[in-house]
Amino acid sequence: MAESKGSTSKEGFGDWCILEAECSDVENDLEKLFDEDTDSDISDLLDDNDLEQGNSRELFHQQECQESEEHLQKLKRKYLSPKAVAQLSPRFESISLSPQQKSKRRLFAEQDSGLELTLTNEAEDVSSEVEVPALDSQPVAGEQSGDIDIHFTALLRANNNRAILMAKFKEAFGVGFYDLTRQFKSYKTCCNAWVISVYAVHDDLLESSKQLLQQHCDYVWIRQTAAMSLFLLCFKVGKNRGTVHKLMMSMLNVHEKQILSEPPKLRNTAAALFWYKGCMGSGGFTYGPYPDWIAQQTILGHQNAEASSFDLSEMIQWAFDNNHMDESDIAYQYAKLAPENSNAVAWLAHNNQARFVRECAAMVRFYKKGQMKEMSMSEWIYARIHEVDGEGHWSTIAKFLRYQQVNFIMFLAALKDLLHAVPKRNCILIYGPPNTGKSAFTMSLIRVLKGRVISFVNSKSQFWLQPLSECKIALLDDVTDPCWIYMDTYLRNGLDGHVVSLDCKHKAPIQTKFPALLLTSNINVHNEVNYRYLHSRIQGFEFPNPFPMKADNTPQFELTDQSWKSFFTRLWQQLELSDHEEEGENGESQRTFQCSTRSANEHL
């Protein structure tokens, strides 16, 4: 018999177990099932009685109170500082003899369900700290040194420490900080006077600063009220805000956040009175004399009565005596005169300063031009060389002319004709190669005699010759072919020494003669046939040699004002200049020009 394929079942599992469910006809009866569905084996499972309202409102109220209490405790934990009690009594906190663990009142109240917890809480409440919001306490003078750390910590916690310092300053001194100062935006702007307010300074350091600041300042003003210390410092040299802060931080051992600094108001009478009266109290300290801006506004003197009125004639007289004819020069120099001149103070206080400066400059030019026209050439040279300080030697000029192979006698003769305005002899030409010293020689002469320089570059303007009507001697430097053509065409009469019509700006053409004229050029006009009509009107001297220089690149021949002063003094007779007019016709000393309303013998 063949074996069956596949696996063989183990013993005991070879037969199938067939079970058959027993069915009954009762389960198929639907009506009976529905009838039995409402019945329950558990009695009174559902309460079918009427419901009552109860006390739900009280329950809701309790839940709301509990939720609010939890929210309040969270806010307390978030915003209240655990060290706030130290600000209430810092001295009491500092006298603790031994460290001990301080218990704090619980933020979240616990349910007291027993006697032991109640007794424990009562024992802890005896030494508990009450947490309150941090307060900015204002210490008295005696408690300041012990409260420095508290003040500084409160200042660092503030979002706007500058606003806090401003408020504390006004509370301490009764005025705002900016009522006494003007604002400097930049930290690099320098000023001699500074107003400095420092918050929470130790008493010992403040006392030492009174002595240390004296070596840096001409005037020291210090006053302390509560935690604020106010300084007015007038330094010997100008300092910027950064330098001032470094000085105060090192001297007072403070942080930069504790310092306010601005320059004082110099023209505010109320601010000046604050500083003047502040030093009279018992708590103030001062060193040095009052600054000028405080003394002028608080101390009554004879200058105050004079400073109220401005005299333009006095300003014109000052500018005339000091040879100030430029508007910017007059304005700057007269403003510098204000500390010692009451009229300058009144001018600074006037609203029409610019108009007065323009009028002053115009009047000085008129006076100077009239004075120049009245003086002869000898008087003009004598007045100019006596304005030169120092002494030189005329031989420097003679040696330079000899170096350039110029006959000194012929040059003196040409210079004499030039100064005396001899017709057809009032123009000298210096010609030669470049770098021979032509311009240096002529410029030095023009400088000492206060002459004018005209430039052909302005020849397109019909007023380019106007400076010739305002001087005794003039220079036309570096004459080129276009300039020679212009002179040959239009300036023959002027070079002859005759009266010409000269067009001037803002006025009608005037009748005048050309002054003594110096020319420099690289062209020898006497060798040019095209300019033959200029040969008899111009005297020429050649400079053929390069200008000599020393090893240190300085000129070997120093053509200075002192050299020309010595030249004219030594050769005064050879140039046939008139005698020195130091005295009048009757032997009396000549009176200086007066253009102010002040009398000659009036007290200054």
From Swiss-Prot:
Name of the protein described by the UniProt record: Replication protein E1
Sequence ranges assigned to domain SF3 helicase in this UniProt record: 406-556
Alphabetized InterPro entries for the sequence: Helicase_SF3_DNA-vir (IPR014015), P-loop_NTPase (IPR027417), PPV_DNA_helicase_E1_C (IPR001177), PPV_DNA_helicase_E1_N (IPR014000), PPV_E1_DBD (IPR046832), PPV_E1_DBD_sf (IPR046935), Rep_E1_papillomaV (IPR016393), Znf_lg_T-Ag_D1_dom_sf (IPR037102)
HAMAP family to which the protein is assigned, alphabetical: PPV_E1
Gene assigned in the entry: E1
Predominant localisation class: host cell
Modification after translation: Phosphorylated. Sumoylated.
Reaction catalysed by this enzyme: Couples ATP hydrolysis with the unwinding of duplex DNA by translocating in the 3'-5' direction; ATP + H2O = ADP + phosphate + H(+)
Enzyme class: isomerase
Tagged with keyword DNA damage: no
Pfam families xref list: PPV_E1_C, PPV_E1_DBD, PPV_E1_N
GO cellular component: host cell nucleus
Compartments (UniProt record): Host nucleus
Record-listed ATP binding positions: G432, P433, P434, N435, T436, G437, K438, S439
Region Disordered: start-end pairs: 579-604
Glycyl lysine isopeptide (Lys-Gly) (interchain with G-Cter in SUMO) crosslink, residue number(s): K513
Motif (Nuclear localization signal): 76-78
Database matches in Gene3D superfamilies: 3.40.1310.10, P-loop containing nucleotide triphosphate hydrolases, Zinc finger, large T-antigen D1 domain
PROSITE patterns in the cross-refs: SF3_HELICASE_1
Stretch list, region DNA-binding region: 144-307
Record keywords: ATP-binding, DNA replication, DNA-binding, Early protein, Helicase, Host nucleus, Hydrolase, Isomerase, Isopeptide bond, Nucleotide-binding, Phosphoprotein, Ubl conjugation
Subunit-structure text: Can form hexamers. Interacts with E2 protein; this interaction increases E1 DNA binding specificity. Interacts with host DNA polymerase subunit POLA2. Interacts with host single stranded DNA-binding protein RPA1. Interacts with host TOP1; this interaction stimulates the enzymatic activity of TOP1.
Entry similarity comment: Belongs to the papillomaviridae E1 protein family.
EC number: 5.6.2.4
